[in-house]
A protein has these predicted regions:
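A short beta-loop-alpha structural element at the N-terminal edge
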Residues: 4-21
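Conserved active-site tyrosine of GNAT-family acetyltransferases
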Residues: 157, 162
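Conserved beta-strand in the GNAT
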Residues: 59, 65-74, 81-86
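Conserved acetyl-CoA binding element of GNAT-fold acetyltransferases
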Residues: 78-89, 119-121
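Conserved acetyl-CoA pyrophosphate-binding loop and the N-cap/start of the following alpha-helix
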Residues: 91-103
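Conserved GNAT acetyl-CoA-binding A-motif
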Residues: 108-149
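C-terminal/domain-terminus segments
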Residues: 70, 84, 166-193
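Active-site rim helix/loop that mediates acceptor-substrate recognition in acyltransferases
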Residues: 22, 26, 30-61, 71
Length: 193
């Protein structure tokens, strides 16, 4: 990382930082997932959900300004979901996304989590899954998955050690799947051969 940064908990009373996170969400997802947070009001709903009790919500600050945000929630058993993750597009490539993910992985493991689930969608023809009827052969489509645009986050997740574990057809609309990845963050178990 080229700039000094800090990662801190985002709380419900951090209004200035919440406003910065909302602006970051709207601007960052405009191309990759335009229907998800199209307005500041929609972004505020996402942030409010991530600030509920039992959730982890962390901001990465560069020069005192929000440069990224990550959240995680307990799903059930030892499974947690990382959602969302956003880094200012002008600051990508500096290791900030990795730093946020590693911070959340540490917190989840500390809370007893073993597996961390992350999802990424394809709503804009950036992978070979877009526009396909994935109900026909979802596992075959995953096996043959290709990334057409290096800006799609799938490669980022794989570089951080996340494994493809599934696909949810039409999750974001017809032909717009959710790609599911997971990583073991807790202690490794002993498995049968």
């Amino acid at each position: 990382m080229t700039d000094s940064h800090t990662i801190e908990t985002l709380g419900p009373g951090d209004e200035d930082r919440i406003a910065q996170v909302c602006a970051l969400l709207v601007s960052s997802f405009r191309e990759l997932s335009p229907a998800w947070v199209p307005t500041t009001e929609a972004a505020r709903e996402v942030v409010a959900e991530a600030l509920e009790p039992g959730m982890f919500s962390r901001v990465l600050l560069v020069g005192g300004r929000v440069a990224g945000w990550v959240g995680a929630r307990h799903e059930y058993g030892s499974l947690w979901e990382l959602h969302p993750l956003v880094v200012d597009p002008a600051l990508r490539g500096h290791g900030y996304g990795r730093a946020l993910v590693e911070d959340i992985e540490r917190l989840v493991a500390g809370a007893g989590g073993l597996t961390l689930l992350a999802s990424t969608s394809d709503e804009s023809n950036r992978t070979s899954l877009y526009g396909q009827d994935l109900f026909r052969d979802p596992l075959g489509a995953l096996r043959d998955l290709k990334i057409f645009d290096r800006l799609h986050p799938l490669g980022f997740w794989q570089r951080l050690g996340y494994t493809l574990v599934g696909v949810v057809p039409d999750a974001e609309g017809p032909g717009k799947p959710s790609i599911e990845l997971a990583k073991r963050v807790g202690p490794r178990a002993t498995f049968r051969e």
